[in-house]
Amino acid sequence: MEKLARKQVQALTPYLSARRIGGSGDVWLNANESPFDNEYNVNFTRLNRYSECQPPELINAYAAYAKVTAEQVLTSRGADEGIELLIRAFCEPNEDAILYCPPTYGMYSISAETIGVETKTIPLTSEWQLDLPSIERNLDNVKLVFVCSPNNPTGNVINRKDILSLLEMTKDRAIVVMDEAYIDFCMEVSTVDLLATYPNLAILRTLSKAFALAGLRCGFTLANKELIDVLSKVIAPYPVPVPVADIATQALSEAGLARMKYQMLDLSANRAYLHAGLMVLNGVTVHEGWGNYLLVQFSDGDAVFKAAWDHGIILRNSPIKDCVRISVGNREECEKTLGFIRNQLM
């Protein structure tokens, strides 16, 4: 069967999500999930009917939250589908390319490789910022430039002046895609205000992180109407199931937003607790981050990751040497993780 697959697919290494990697334990801090399991009222009386392609109540609710117009919003099955839609809509297979800046989210390259679109990589600088001169030298045939901010796994925010420079250098050449999956934790640095100035800007959002709805698979692409109209040509006819739209709309209601903001305060306190406890340990460097996770460097990160794994504390190893990414869980999970690491390093 393998030989019947397309050559690009035969050569493809699938994205190793936290769930694919697996593990066995009672502390799961490897997927940047929220520890809050919120309840929703779900209407199961309309499941014999197809959902609307873009449910108006959901679109209007997210537009209000994001402070954009409804025509600037497209909802999809997670932000991952938004990545795929952008590549399918704007990149010619075996002709065009995307560009991204590692270390960063791995689905940009996999989504491109799946359909035969070249990937160009320009590593982030030593301070995990954009290497603008190198990006500019490598823009030939590039249709999409993916920038994650706050970046996963490093946690830092990309300098706004560099984003502006990137938008300027790609005018009439390429679309800059800002992946803002973690922006709810630092909305003040969102690039959403730049949509008014730059038609070559697209923004990816999700309900998986701050809204505690990773299992719902609901994401959004924000852009100007002309770009949204192009994406609408390639999206599936019924991308958002009825229960998903119902739950997401509830999460974006006044009560839902109040709960989300309260829970973010709790997560912020837990992140500060974890950060303070780790940074005083010998041989440990905690990198400043803005999301619901911390990138932590040890003298031997692989050893810490494996020891925690064997102890039932599931963290995420990192492509960055000796670094482990730790999601911020509830206080009990953070205490257990910190206590284990402290004992491990003694």
Swiss-Prot record:
CDD domains of this UniProt entry? Answer: AAT_like
Provide the family line. Answer: Belongs to the class-II pyridoxal-phosphate-dependent aminotransferase family. Histidinol-phosphate aminotransferase subfamily.
List the InterPro entries hit by this protein, alphabetically: Aminotrans_II_pyridoxalP_BS (IPR001917), Aminotransferase_I/II_large (IPR004839), HisP_aminotrans (IPR005861), PyrdxlP-dep_Trfase (IPR015424), PyrdxlP-dep_Trfase_major (IPR015421), PyrdxlP-dep_Trfase_small (IPR015422)
What are the EC numbers? 2.6.1.9
Keywords on this record? Answer: Amino-acid biosynthesis, Aminotransferase, Histidine biosynthesis, Pyridoxal phosphate, Transferase
* Modification type N6-(pyridoxal phosphate)lysine: residues: 209
User: Under which pathway is this protein filed?
Assistant: Amino-acid biosynthesis; L-histidine biosynthesis; L-histidine from 5-phospho-alpha-D-ribose 1-diphosphate: step 7/9
| Reactions accelerated catalytically | L-histidinol phosphate + 2-oxoglutarate = 3-(imidazol-4-yl)-2-oxopropyl phosphate + L-glutamate
Q: Which domain of life is it from?
A: Bacteria
Subunit-level organization: Homodimer.
Its needed co-factors are:
pyridoxal 5'-phosphate
Query: What SUPFAM superfamilies has UniProt attached to this entry?
Result: PLP-dependent transferases
Query: What processes in GO biological process is this protein linked to?
Result: L-histidine biosynthetic process
Q: What is the lineage of its organism?
A: Bacteria, Pseudomonadati, Pseudomonadota, Gammaproteobacteria, Vibrionales
- Into which EC class is this enzyme placed? transferase
Q: Name the encoding gene, please.
A: hisC
GO-annotated molecular function: histidinol-phosphate transaminase activity; pyridoxal phosphate binding
Task: Please name the Pfam families in this protein's record.
Answer: Aminotran_1_2
- The protein in question is named Histidinol-phosphate aminotransferase
